[in-house]
């Protein structure tokens, strides 16, 4: 009896649960919270890159013939793409650009980090790359 009740409650919660999109979450935040979120992404990216470089240096310090592989360079490029150089410390500009991105219905399912990457590339005037990432994200996260 209890198993049936648990199953019915579980099934009911699955059917009646609302799906929150990344755009809904972003719109529910106040501007201070949006700025804090973006600062957190920037800080975690910088810390991740720093610690990764330290670990690579520790592991390959003694090997004189070691050359940094391309995938490590690409990893650092992806982390750098999350941060807009032109916007500098004006994180509110990035938050407003994310607001504009999420105002389009086609972009509501794009995860926040991908949206931040697209917006940062656009702010750095790499519009071709930003448009390509936007089209790929719209295709990957279609809204029905």
Which residues does each PLM region occupy?
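Compact alpha-helical subdomains of small soluble proteins
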Residues: 20, 52-144
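Generic hydrophobic secondary-structure signal
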Residues: 5-7, 37-42, 94, 98
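Sec-dependent N-terminal signal peptides
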Residues: 2-17
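N-terminal secretory signal peptides
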Residues: 18-68
């Amino acid at each position: 009896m209890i198993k049936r009740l648990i199953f019915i409650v579980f099934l009911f919660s699955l059917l009646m649960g609302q799906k929150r999109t990344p755009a809904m979450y972003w719109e529910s935040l106040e501007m201070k919270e949006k700025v804090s979120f973006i600062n957190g992404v920037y800080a975690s990216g910088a810390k991740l890159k720093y610690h990764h470089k330290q670990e690579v240096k520790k592991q390959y310090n003694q090997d004189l013939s070691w050359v940094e592989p391309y995938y490590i360079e690409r990893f650092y490029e992806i982390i750098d793409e999350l941060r807009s150089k032109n916007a500098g410390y004006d994180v509110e500009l990035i938050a407003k650009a994310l607001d504009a991105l999420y105002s389009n219905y086609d972009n509501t399912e794009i995860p926040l980090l991908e949206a931040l990457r697209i917006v940062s590339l656009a702010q750095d005037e790499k519009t071709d790359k930003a448009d390509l990432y936007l089209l790929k994200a719209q295709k990957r996260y279609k809204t029905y």
